[in-house]
Amino acid sequence: MSELLFETYGVPSIGNDTYLFVPLLSIVHGSFEVRIVDAKDVSSYFLKGEPVLGACCRTNVGGFHITDFLRQLLSLKYPYHSASITWEKAEELKKEHCYVALDYMSELQIFKNNKEEAEEKTRYWQLPWVPPPVEEPPSEEELARKAALKEKAGQRLRDMAAAKRSQKIAELEKQLSYLEELMEQLDGAEEEEATAILGRSGYLSQQEIKSAILKATQSLRKAKGESNGNEEKADASGVDKYPLVSVPDETLTPEQLKEKKKQILLKTTTEGRMRAKQRRAEEEALREKQEEERRLENPELYLEELRARYSELSDRVDQRKRQKLNGGKTNGNHNSSGGVGRGERLNAAQKERMRLLTSAAFDRGKGEDTFGTRDEDWLVYKKMSKDNDDDDDGNDDDESELARIASKIQDMDPTFVNKAEAVQQTPEPPKVRTLTAEDYRISIGIERFRCPEILFQPGMIGIDQAGIDEMVSISLRRLMEDEAVKERLCQSILVTGGCSLIPGMIPRLESGIRQFRPYLSPLKLVRAADPLIDAWRGAAAFAASSKFGRHTFSLADYREHGENLFHRYNIVYSL
């Protein structure tokens, strides 16, 4: 400190020892001859009358730590408002709202159990908050204007749709007129002339033209909004869809023969699919009937069978999914030793796929093309698929069966949860709540007395020291064994410093000191007249006295003796 004052600030002289014992200056101003408990903003000192340095104690906890502890607690409690909880604001809150509890644990129990009393002791700090703008309901004029704009836009769309419909009707009428005129020409023409007319028109036969006329007529009626009574009958007619199937081959040209083969293939495929669909529907109806009979006969057994079937199918589907994710490594004969040929790494399904691809690539137009006459012919595309596996044939069937069984179980057991639905269920998006003034209100309850408590329990902030009440007893033990002197000192304890202004400080300090004093021993604590500036006024009075010159250390003395002249007291700062 002396080096800082002389070297940096260039002061001419400083008090010999008084700047080390600032609380002593309160006595100079107040004319006391007492023990001093300085609860100032930085540290706390304990002195007895004239300085008895062997009995001095010092704590590292003061008003600064209370303010910083309060700021940290509020910042952790309200992290979104940490920018508003500045050190200066925490200092202001400490001076206005903090107090020292006479019994710390009892005060905590009040906030734990007694809600009404705790609410009375709680203080609130309202941060600046601007309410969101309230949307005013539109006026009648605004509603009328929007309705007019909406009606205008709707009318414009209706006009556009009507114009488009009129254009389509005109095109259909023109097409229908052309087709009817073409049919009139074919009715009165000979065979060679009819063939030439068909070649120019792009149609293959009169049946195809009739089918086109029927479709155009239906489209025209639909565009005009008229009913189509014979639409279903026309759609059901195989002659209209496949006009060349019933025509003899002798009367067809080579191009028409190719088209006839395509129509036969499509017709056969469609009929096969319809038969398979009807067969599956009949089997499904029969199975549903049998299951319903079993359910009515023994519902518990039926439900148990459904659960077992569901578990089996679920495991099978999960296993297939894991195999696909692992690249199908669980299928086929895989050799992990390396150095084998391509054929040795293929399983049976992959070899069959390669054979089909090779056959399709080199078998071009050999013999009569009868592909598609049987339903089984179309399974070749599934076998040729790259994703095909030896277990993939029933994959879709298993998943559909699994969904069906899960639906039946849910009908009988509402508490059942389908695994697929549980996995596919997407989490709900977080709901955004509008912030209110309550969200910008900071509550200060336990913090009011918890922060000043660190003066008596420094361990709360990690400082391994005794509290100021215990330090008084330690200071007394360091004095002489004369009990009369101790009793006289305990009757005039001066409490000074900024922290002594905290409400409840004097009663709590007195209660703590009594615990270390004999029963019914006299004890009196006095707060300084002005704890904040009494020390400064005492220093000013001492500096103005004639004795001040004998207690100063000048710059010349500093340069001659150095700062070691100050190191002559053995004060124990820690306990």
From Swiss-Prot:
Gene Ontology BP annotations: regulation of DNA-templated transcription
Cellular localization per UniProt: Nucleus
Major subcellular site: nucleus
Keywords: Coiled coil, Nucleus
Biased composition (Basic and acidic residues): 270-298
Superkingdom field: Eukaryota
SUPFAM superfamilies in alphabetical order: Actin-like ATPase domain
Family: Belongs to the actin family. ARP5 subfamily.
Protein name per the record: Actin-related protein 5
Organism of provenance: Oryza sativa subsp. japonica
Highest classification ranks of the organism: Eukaryota, Viridiplantae, Streptophyta, Embryophyta, Tracheophyta
